[in-house]
């Protein structure tokens, strides 16, 4: 599986230790991993696209074969622009599987030369979601176990400015 470029797309709002774990493991499986940070206007992220790209770059710095790029539009257009051959997706629970399985099937119908590879998180990250991390942070809870210290600082600043 080493040859080729794998694209790990997501909103990453914020970039969690679960995301980082998946990137670390993917970096051992593929020659190159591109973290594709999606604009995701429909989700109304608390961080701007530029902020999310910078946060992700900071977190993935230790992985020499990983780079980060933002995108707006169709994932497949981004994948082609990055010369990607594989879409990486994380699966935490059965609910993730159902949605991701449908997406992988649709992508295979539309783009038969692109594969989707699913990775499950390490046990300690199984229940982390960026949505939960954001909500806990908004309510003043401690999310230090779920994000890197640099992410924590930015997240705390962002939620305190919105109160």
Curated annotation (Swiss-Prot):
Gene for this chain: coaD
Family affiliation: Belongs to the bacterial CoaD family.
Binding, substrate: 11, 43, 75, 89
Organism, as annotated: Azoarcus sp. (strain BH72)
GO biological process: coenzyme A biosynthetic process
Listed GO MF terms: ATP binding; pantetheine-phosphate adenylyltransferase activity
Function: Reversibly transfers an adenylyl group from ATP to 4'-phosphopantetheine, yielding dephospho-CoA (dPCoA) and pyrophosphate.
CDD domains membership: PPAT (cd02163)
Catalytic activity: (R)-4'-phosphopantetheine + ATP + H(+) = 3'-dephospho-CoA + diphosphate
Entry superkingdom: Bacteria
EC number: 2.7.7.3
Record-given protein name: Phosphopantetheine adenylyltransferase
Class of enzymatic activity (EC top level): transferase
């Amino acid at each position: 599986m080493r040859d080729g470029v794998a694209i790990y797309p997501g909103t990453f709002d914020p970039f969690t230790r679960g995301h980082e774990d998946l990137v670390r493991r993917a970096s051992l499986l593929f020659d190159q991993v591109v973290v594709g940070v999606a604009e995701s206007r429909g989700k109304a992220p608390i961080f701007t696209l530029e902020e999310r790209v910078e946060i992700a770059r900071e977190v993935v710095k230790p992985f020499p074969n990983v780079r980060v790029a933002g995108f707006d539009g169709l994932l497949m257009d981004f994948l082609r622009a990055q010369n990607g051959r594989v879409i990486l997706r994380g699966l935490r629970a059965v609910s993730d599987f159902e949605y991701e399985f449908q997406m992988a099937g649709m992508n295979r119908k539309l783009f038969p030369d692109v594969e989707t590879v699913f990775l499950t998180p390490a046990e300690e990250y199984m229940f982390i979601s960026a949505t939960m991390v954001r909500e806990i942070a908004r309510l003043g809870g401690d999310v230090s176990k779920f994000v890197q210290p640099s992410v924590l600082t930015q997240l705390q600043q962002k939620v305190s400015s919105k109160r």
